[in-house]
Amino acid sequence: MAKSNIKLIFKEENTLNKFSILFFNYLSQHKCWLKNCNYHSIKNNLYIHTHNYSYIDNYINNNSIKYNYKIIKL
């Protein structure tokens, strides 16, 4: 499966910071994601290059914290 480039856009910068901490903790528990996922952030956007972008969307939607975000597949 080819990797997809996605961009997560958050409405507030502190939301990106809160999300990043939780998401990267989750990634560290799922080592296969870390190997298959490259990421960086610019302003309120988190750019991810991954095989598993649908899993990222599911993770965000199933999290107890609700984030004001959208995903764009690049």
Language model features with spans:
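Short intrinsically disordered terminal tails
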Residues: 1-2, 74
